[in-house]
Amino acid sequence: MKIKIQKIHPNALIPKYQTEGSSGFDLHAVENAVIKPHSVGLVRIGICLSLEVGYELQVRTRSGLALNHQVMVLNSPGTVDNDYRGEIKVILANLSDKDFTIQVGDRIAQGVVQKTYKAEFIECEQLDETSRGSGGFGSTGVSKA
């Protein structure tokens, strides 16, 4: 698949896969920034893109940032729809007790291209019964003593 990329910032880098087997490609910051402890920051990537119809870009947390710095993409995965043409930006949450410093060119998230499907919604009077029923949060986890 070919994805058209428009650089709108002089520090923008074209995304690339780090290995042949990588499903995600790196997204790089175009500006220096500091995200304070227990705070959220919006990080510019400096690119716009054009995806084929039927695909989305998912913006995901880099595992190293999560493990080593407790920094994650807040709305992970963030969704970039195929008809969006604005700048890609990443919402990062710093869950740590330390400042998180971002330098120009830092890999701050990863992108994964995914196929999308359109559902047809059909209103009905009642849904089929299942063994789970309406059991929600935690209902299939640890048993209650």
Curated annotation (Swiss-Prot):
Answer whether the UniProt record assigns the keyword Metal-binding to this protein. Answer: yes
Question: Highest taxon of the source?
Answer: Bacteria
Pfam (any one): dUTPase
The EC number(s) given in the record are 3.6.1.23
Report residues binding substrate.
62-64, 75, 79-81, 89
Cofactor field: Mg(2+)
Cross-referenced HAMAP family? dUTPase_bact
Protein name from the UniProt record: Deoxyuridine 5'-triphosphate nucleotidohydrolase
What is the organism field in this record? Answer: Helicobacter acinonychis (strain Sheeba)
